Amino acid sequence: MTVIDNHEALAEDGEMSEASARDYFELLKPRVMSLVVFTAFAGLVLAPGHINPVLGLIAILCIAVGAGASGALNMWYDADIDAIMSRTAKRPIPAGRIAPSEALAFGLVLSGFSVVILGLAVNWLSAAILAFTIFFYAVIYTMWLKRSTPQNIVIGGAAGAFPPMIGWACVTNSVTIESTVLFLIIFLWTPAHFWALALFKMRDYEAVGVPMLPNVSGERVTKHQIVAYAVLTAICAVLPSFLGFASFGYGLVAAALGAIFVYCSIAVWRMPDGDLKMIPAKKLFAFSIFYLFAVFSALMIDRLAAILVSQAGGSF
């Protein structure tokens, strides 16, 4: 499989049209950043103890900026293949609105800024995890794994799983079994989510030589893997109840959501190979986003309910 690597063919700075603030905001991958902010906030809420609201806001902003910075570095490196893929061709760099060198500088400055401010304002453990997350996504995943192995999403998914752990560390200045479970929920969720996308975007990935699992091992293997990871995610999502940092009620909600997630993955598994419409894969991709938001929302609601009951003198 030939991997596209044509960064030098991109337009030089002088050939760029004038960039707007919106273009730079797009470099931050705002949709991805919103999920990062949400799960990091969940880590803050779920962690035992308290954090000054101002410091909590600074922490969330730093995590958001750090996530956006890694997105900018990803777009800088992937501009050559983004120009070919239909879903990414209109991004600021391949569209000629931002020069690659400007995107690189933007990403590096924001990376340093977010890590240093988080360390100075909150604690250096959370800053170190944020720095490692940026490095992992921009270098380990983007520059190495993405173009070299069909397991790119499995290993690279760790980058997207760190935010709740960072949020937790902002409050406790520690990494615990509870924050590790939050990490694992996202880590195990990522393959089913992205391989569903890879199924109905197979031709795009094939055109640029990115070795996604459907292109390397075929649809059938990918579908088996999607079901396996959906089951593992559903099991992991109920662990907070068994570990004592969420209620039995949360466990029931997580189990119900997990059952739907697995059902959607089985629908993909039953989908005939070569199906051009890929409707079950598209439905799984959409539901997987809702699933993750719903699980972390349920965890936060459960935590807030426990606090309210405790303050009222009851038990939960």
From Swiss-Prot:
One of its GO terms (molecular function) is protoheme IX farnesyltransferase activity. Its EC number is 2.5.1.141. PROSITE patterns: UBIA. The chain crosses the membrane at residues 32-52, 53-73, 93-113, 116-136, 152-172, 180-200, 221-241, 252-271, 289-309. The keyword Phosphoprotein does not apply. One of its GO terms (biological process) is heme O biosynthetic process. The keyword Transmembrane applies. CDD domains: PT_UbiA_Cox10. It is a multi-pass membrane protein. Pfam families: UbiA. Its main location: membrane. Pathway: Porphyrin-containing compound metabolism; heme O biosynthesis; heme O from protoheme: step 1/1. It is an enzyme of class 2 (transferase). Keywords: Cell inner membrane, Cell membrane, Heme biosynthesis, Membrane, Transferase, Transmembrane, Transmembrane helix. It is found in: Cell inner membrane. It catalyses: heme b + (2E,6E)-farnesyl diphosphate + H2O = Fe(II)-heme o + diphosphate. GO terms for cellular component: plasma membrane. Carbon 2 of the heme B porphyrin ring is defined according to the Fischer nomenclature. Converts heme B (protoheme IX) to heme O by substitution of the vinyl group on carbon 2 of heme B porphyrin ring with a hydroxyethyl farnesyl side group. Belongs to the UbiA prenyltransferase family. Protoheme IX farnesyltransferase subfamily. This is Protoheme IX farnesyltransferase. It comes from Rhizobium etli (strain ATCC 51251 / DSM 11541 / JCM 21823 / NBRC 15573 / CFN 42). The lineage of its organism: Bacteria, Pseudomonadati, Pseudomonadota, Alphaproteobacteria, Hyphomicrobiales.
